């Protein structure tokens, strides 16, 4: 999921 990318990389 793309949402997980920004969520983890915040």
Swiss-Prot record:
Entry EC number(s): 3.4.11.-
GO molecular-function terms, A-Z: aminopeptidase activity
Keyword Chloroplast applies: no
EC category: hydrolase
Entry's pH dependence statement: Optimum pH is 7.5.
Native organism: Capnocytophaga gingivalis
Cofactor(s) required, per the database record: Mg(2+); Ca(2+)
Protein name: Aminopeptidase
Superkingdom, taxonomy of origin: Bacteria
Keyword terms, alphabetized: Aminopeptidase, Calcium, Hydrolase, Magnesium, Protease
GO biological process entries: proteolysis
Lineage of source species: Bacteria, Pseudomonadati, Bacteroidota, Flavobacteriia, Flavobacteriales
UniProt keyword Protease, yes or no: yes
Function: Aminopeptidase which hydrolyzes substrates with free N-terminal amino acid residues but not N-terminal blocked ones. May be important in the nutrition and pathogenesis of the organism in the human oral cavity.
